C-alpha cells in the first residue's frame, strides 16, 4: 500500500497576485497572509514565452519584507531568461529565514530540464515543474523524482481571468496515480480559472492538492472569505462531496 504521503498530500490554497493592485503589492501580500493562505504565487512572464510582461526578482524580493508566508515563483520565461536569471529567482523566492521557496520551471521552455531543476535545488530552492494544457503527462515522468511539485495549467498562461479547461482531469489523475505507484512525495498544483465551485472540487477529486486562484479569490469582498471558501470546497471534495459540472 502506498504511503499516505503520496496519496493524501495536504490541501493548500495559493493566491496568484496577478489581479492585485500592483502599486500596493506590499500591502497585498500582508493582506493575503492575514487571510490565511498557504503560499503566494508570483507569475513571472518575460513577454517571450508568453505574450505578457509581469514581475522580476526585485519585486518579489521587495514583497518578502512585508510578510512571512512562503512564496512560489512560476517561470513563464524563455530558456535564456530561465538560465541566466535562475539564481536571482531562487533567492527572491526564499522564505523569511532563507527557507527554500518553490521555483517552477516550464517543461516546454527548457530543453535541459534536469539541469535547471537540479540547479534550483543546488541554489537552495524547491524545484518544481509546470506544463501547459496541451502538454502530455509523459513529458514530466522522467523528472518526477527531482521535483516537489508538478503544476498542471488549466488555461494557456499569459493572462489572468481565463476560462478553466475541464479536460485536464485525466492528466491530473494519471499524474497522481504515477506518484502513488512510485511512492513519491510530490504535490500536484492546478492553475487557471480555479474557483470555489466545481472547478476546484473536481481537480481535488482527481488528485490535485495545491490550488492557485487569482480572480477566483480576489473577486470576494474580503480575501479571507475567498481563501476559506476555496479551502472548504476542496476539503468537501476530498471527503467525497464532489460538485458536478454545470449543465
Q: Where are each of the predicted segments found?
A:
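Hydrophobic faces of well-ordered beta-strands that scaffold small-molecule active sites
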Residues: 11-17, 40-42, 63, 71-75, ...
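Conserved, mostly hydrophobic/aromatic
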Residues: 25, 32, 43, 89, ...
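Catalytic cores of alpha/beta
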Residues: 29, 81-92, 135-146, 193-211
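Glycine-rich, proline-tolerant flexible connector loops at the mouths of alpha/beta enzymes
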Residues: 39-57, 155-163
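Glycine/small-residue-rich loop that forms an oxyanion/phosphate-binding "nest" at active or ligand-binding sites
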Residues: 52-120, 129
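Glycine-rich phosphate-binding active-site loops on the catalytic face of alpha/beta enzymes
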Residues: 98-109, 151-162, 206-226
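Histidine/lysine/aspartate-rich catalytic loop segments that bind and position anionic ligands
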Residues: 130-170, 174
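C-terminal helical cap(s) of enzyme catalytic domains, especially alpha/beta-barrels
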Residues: 219-247
